[in-house]
Curated annotation (Swiss-Prot):
<feature type="region of interest" description="Cysteine-rich">
    <location>
        <begin position="38"/>
        <end position="53"/>
    </location>
</feature>
<keyword id="KW-0010">Activator</keyword>
<keyword id="KW-0694">RNA-binding</keyword>
<dbReference type="GO" id="GO:0050434">
    <property type="term" value="P:positive regulation of viral transcription"/>
</dbReference>
<keyword id="KW-0945">Host-virus interaction</keyword>
<keyword id="KW-0805">Transcription regulation</keyword>
<comment type="subunit">
    <text>Binds to bovine CCNT1/cyclin-T1.</text>
</comment>
<keyword id="KW-0804">Transcription</keyword>
<dbReference type="Pfam" id="PF00539">
    <property type="entry name" value="Tat"/>
</dbReference>
<feature type="region of interest" description="Core">
    <location>
        <begin position="54"/>
        <end position="65"/>
    </location>
</feature>
<feature type="short sequence motif" description="Nuclear localization signal and RNA-binding (TAR)">
    <location>
        <begin position="66"/>
        <end position="83"/>
    </location>
</feature>
<dbReference type="InterPro" id="IPR036963">
    <property type="entry name" value="Tat_dom_sf"/>
</dbReference>
<protein>
    <recommendedName>
        <fullName>Protein Tat</fullName>
    </recommendedName>
</protein>
<comment type="function">
    <text>Nuclear transcriptional activator of viral gene expression, that is essential for viral transcription from the LTR promoter and replication. Acts as a sequence-specific molecular adapter, directing components of the cellular transcription machinery to the viral RNA to promote processive transcription elongation by the RNA polymerase II (RNA pol II) complex, thereby increasing the level of full-length transcripts. Tat binds to a hairpin structure at the 5'-end of all nascent viral mRNAs referred to as the transactivation responsive RNA element (TAR RNA) in a CCNT1-independent mode.</text>
</comment>
<dbReference type="GO" id="GO:0003723">
    <property type="term" value="F:RNA binding"/>
</dbReference>
<dbReference type="InterPro" id="IPR001831">
    <property type="entry name" value="IV_Tat"/>
</dbReference>
<dbReference type="GO" id="GO:0044196">
    <property type="term" value="C:host cell nucleolus"/>
</dbReference>
Length: 114
């Protein structure tokens, strides 16, 4: 029987009931470690396997220095900016691609070369 640092927990079974679920020691003697290898599953039973499983799977705290990778911006992606007021001769240009018909008609109407 472990010392006073251990707590006995009753877990819900995979069938959803609390009756007769597996009993486990949450905070084991850290020198001895858990009795079995930590499972890779993140179900509610495996989260409570040991203190390390609870911190990593249950709370999402990782102490191994790994960080989530961020996606980088694609190389072929371009952003179209509207022309400044001084370039367009005092007229504001619409913020659209120059190949669209509405942009070309607006530019012809106001005397601006697209």
């Amino acid at each position: 029987m472990p010392g006073p640092w251990a707590t006995t927990l009753t877990f819900p079974g995979h069938n959803g009931g609390f009756g007769g679920g597996p009993k486990c020691w949450l905070f084991w003697n850290t020198c001895a470690g858990p009795r079995r290898v930590c499972p890779k599953c993140s179900c509610p039973i495996c989260v409570w396997h040991c203190q390390l499983c609870f911190l990593q799977k249950g709370l999402g705290i990782r102490h191994d220095g790994r960080r989530k990778k961020r996606g980088t911006r694609g190389k072929g992606r371009k952003i179209h900016y509207a022309r400044s007021i001084t370039e367009s001769g005092g007229q504001r240009a619409p913020n659209c691609a120059s190949s669209s018909a509405s942009c070309q008609t607006w530019a012809l109407k106001h005397g601006i070369n697209c």
